[in-house]
Regions:
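Structural motif
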Residues: 151, 179, 265-270, 440-442
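Proline/serine/threonine-rich low-complexity linkers at boundaries of modular beta-sandwich domains
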Residues: 40-62
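Aromatic-Pro/Gly-enriched surface loop or interdomain linker
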Residues: 84-89, 93-112, 159-260, 489-492, ...
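Active-site-proximal beta-strand/loop segments in catalytic clefts of secreted hydrolases
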Residues: 155, 181-185, 249-253, 270-272, ...
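Long, C-terminal catalytic modules of enzymes
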Residues: 304-507
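C-terminal region of N-terminal signal peptides and the immediate post-cleavage residues
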Residues: 1-23, 27
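Ligand-binding face of N-terminal immunoglobulin V-set domains in extracellular IgSF glycoproteins
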Residues: 64-99, 104-169
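Helical hinge/lid and interdomain linker segments adjacent to catalytic or ligand-binding clefts
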Residues: 119-129, 137-140, 145, 224-310, ...
Length: 507
C-alpha cells in the first residue's frame, strides 16, 4: 500500500557534454583566489571550470575514495582515503556554484599522488555495517578555500577511471545569511557501497539491511557524489546566481553546534533531507522561533530519527537507524531516543510541527496544481488557478494533515491530486508563519530541486518528463522564496492567511 518506503534514491546520472579528462594544472592552489574580505560576491565573479563534470567514470574499482571529514572550516586539514590500482592519480577540488554557467570553479589541484589498491571491505555482523579500514592517502590543507559545497574529483592518471568525493567547507558564522544545509546523513542512508545501506542488503530487502552505516566508505551513486548532484547542486547553482548572502553547513554540524544558526536569515533544506537527529531538529526549531525562516525544498524531510556515533576516524561518522527494530538498539536500551520514524513511538514527535506538511507516501507521478495564484510565492509566474505542471509531483510527496500537529495559520497554495497505489490524496505546497516572524515554506514534492534544471523541450538535465514550463515555474517561485527569506523574518511582511477551511474543510 502507499506509504512510507523508498524507491531508487535519485534520477539517472545527468547527461553532459563536458569532457571527461582533467585540465592540466600545478599542485596546490589553482586559478584566481577570492578576496576573503569582500564576501561571496567576489567569489561568484571569478571564472569557472566546466571540466568538473564526469561523463565516463570507468569501471568499478578503477578509483574511489572518501574524505575523513564530512565538513571542514576553511583552513582545516582533512584526509583523503583513496583506492586505485593506478600508479598515480590527480585530485581536483571544485567549488560548486553558478560561475556564469560553468557551475564550478577549480580551487585546488594535486597531481601525481601515488596510488594503491586498498583492502577489501568487511561487514560487522552485529549491525551489518560495511567497514573499510582504508589508510589515509593524502592530507589536504584547505587554506584559502572559500566556504561552499565542493566536489573533489579523483582522476586515475592512466585514464582508467574518475570519481567524486563530496565535501562541505562550512561557514563559521551564519548571521545574516541564508544557510544551505546539506544532508549527508541521507546520502549515507541510501549509500549501497559494499552491498549494504539502511534499506538493502544482499537479499535486496530490509531483513539484511544495515542498522548502522558509516562515512568511512565511498558513495556508490552518481560517480561518488551521493545524492548531492540531483537533490542539492541545482539549488546551490540558483542561490549563487542570485547573489544572495549564503552560508554553508550540513545537518550534522547543525546538530553538533546549538548556536550555529544564530542570526541566520533562513535555513534551506534541500531536495531529499530525510534523516535527522533530534538535536538537529531542536536547533532548527529554535532558530525558527528566533526569527529564522525555513524553506523545505523537497519532501519526506525529517522523517527518520537517527543518532550519530564515532568511528576510528572521528566523531559523528556513524548514522544509526534501527527503524522497526529500534527495540534491539543497545543505544536505546541505554536511554537514547528510538532510532525510528519521528511520528511513531516511543517518543512520537511528528515532523509536521516543524514543516507544516507531513510525508504522505510514494510512489506518485502527478501534475503540480496551483490553487492560490495570487500568493506572493507565485509573483512573476503568470499562473492562474488550476494551472497544471505534469510530473512535478513525485516520487514522494507531503501534504497538510491536521491529524498530526499542524502550525497555524497555514496557507496551502498548491493542492495537487495524487493517486498513490490506489489511495487518493493530495500533495500540498504550504506556507505558515510563527510569532517570531519566521516563515516556513514547504514544496510538498521531492522533485522540486531537480526541476530547477528543466529547460527546453526535452527537459534538459531534469528527469521524469518534467518540462521547461515546470522549470520556469519552479525557478521563479524558488527565487521569490529565497529573496523574501534572505530579507529577514518573512512573516512580518508576508503573514500566512490560513485557508485550511476552504482547502480541507478544517476549522
Amino acid at each position: 500500500s502507499c506509504g512510507p518506503g523508498h524507491p531508487d534514491p535519485a534520477a539517472a546520472p545527468h547527461p553532459s557534454t563536458a569532457p571527461a579528462g582533467s585540465a592540466p594544472g600545478d599542485p596546490g592552489t589553482v586559478g584566481p583566489a577570492a578576496d576573503g574580505h569582500s564576501g561571496p560576491k567576489s567569489e561568484r565573479s571569478l571564472p569557472g571550470n566546466p571540466d568538473w563534470e564526469i561523463t565516463d567514470p570507468g569501471p568499478d574499482g578503477a578509483i574511489e575514495g572518501f574524505a575523513d571529514r564530512v565538513s571542514v572550516l576553511p583552513g582545516e586539514t582533512f584526509g583523503l582515503h583513496v583506492s586505485t590500482p593506478a600508479a598515480a592519480f590527480t585530485v581536483s577540488a571544485y567549488r560548486m556554484g553558478w560561475y556564469d554557467g560553468a557551475r564550478a570553479r577549480l580551487v585546488w589541484r594535486r597531481e601525481h599522488v601515488p596510488g594503491g589498491k586498498q583492502a577489501a571491505p568487511h561487514v560487522d555482523p552485529a549491525t551489518r555495517t560495511v567497514l573499510t579500514g582504508w589508510q589515509r592517502t593524502l592530507a589536504v590543507d584547505t587554506a584559502g578555500w572559500p566556504e561552499g559545497a565542493y566536489l573533489l574529483r579523483l582522476d586515475a592518471e592512466d585514464g582508467s577511471g574518475r570519481r567524486y568525493v563530496p565535501l562541505t567547507v562550512r561557514s563559521a558564522s551564519t548571521a545574516g545569511k541564508a544557510v544551505v544545509m546539506s544532508a549527508p546523513a541521507t546520502w549515507q542512508a541510501y549509500n549501497e557501497w559494499g552491498g549494504y545501506s539502511l534499506y538493502n542488503g544482499p537479499t535486496g530487502g530490509l531483513a539484511t539491511r544495515s542498522l548502522k552505516v558509516v562515512f568511512d566508505r565511498p558513495y556508490d551513486y552518481d560517480h561518488g557524489a551521493g545524492l548531492f548532484l540531483v537533490y542539492e547542486a541545482p539549488l546551490v547553482t540558483l542561490a549563487e546566481r542570485l547573489g544572495l548572502p549564503l552560508a554553508y553547513t550540513t545537518g550534522i554540524d547543525v546538530a553538533r553546534e546549538p548556536g550555529l544558526l544564530a542570526g541566520a536569515s533562513a535555513v534551506l533544506s534541500l531536495g531529499h533531507d530525510e534523516y535527522w537527529s533530534p538535536e538537529q531538529r531542536a536547533n532548527v526549531v529554535a532558530a525558527r522561533d528566533a526569527g529564522t525562516n525555513l524553506a523545505v525544498l523537497g519532501a519526506n524531510c525529517c522523517f527518520r530519527r537517527v543518532r550519530f556515533e564515532p568511528t576510528d576516524l572521528g566523531p559523528d561518522r556513524t548514522v544509526v537507524c534501527y527503524k522497526d527494530a529500534w527495540a534491539q538498539d543497545p543505544g536505546h536500551r541505554s536511554g537514547a531516543p528510538a532510532t525510528t520514524d519521528f511520528r511513531v513511538g516511543p517518543g512520537a514527535d511528528p515532523e509536521s510541527s516543524m514543516l507544516g506538511v507531513i510525508y504522505d507516501g510514494y510512489p506518485v507521478d502527478a501534475p503540480y496544481v496551483v490553487t492560490s495564484p495570487g500568493h506572493w510565492a507565485f509573483e512573476g509566474t503568470g499562473v492562474a488557478a488550476g494551472a497544471s505542471f505534469p510530473h512535478l509531483v513525485g516520487v514522494e510527496y507531503d501534504r497538510v494533515d491536521t491529524g498530526f500537529p499542524t502550525p497555524r495559520p497555514i496557507e496551502v497554495i498548491a493542492h495537487s491530486p495524487v493517486v498513490c497505489e490506489g489511495r487518493h490524496s493530495h500533495s500540498d505546497t504550504a506556507y505558515y508563519t510563527v510569532p517570531s516572524g519566521a516563515g516556513v515554506f514547504s514544496t510538498g514534492t521531492m522533485r522540486w530541486v531537480e526541476a530547477l534544471e528543466a529547460r527546453g523541450p526535452g527537459g534538459g538535465r531534469a528527469d521524469h518528463g518534467i518540462d521547461s514550463h515546470a522549470g520556469d515555474l519552479v525557478r521563479q517561485v524558488t527565487e521569490n522564496v529565497l529573496r523574501a527569506f534572505a530579507a529577514g523574518p518573512a512573516g512580518r511582511t508576508r503573514p500566512a492567511l490560513d485557508n485550511l477551511a476552504g482547502v480541507y474543510g478544517t476549522a
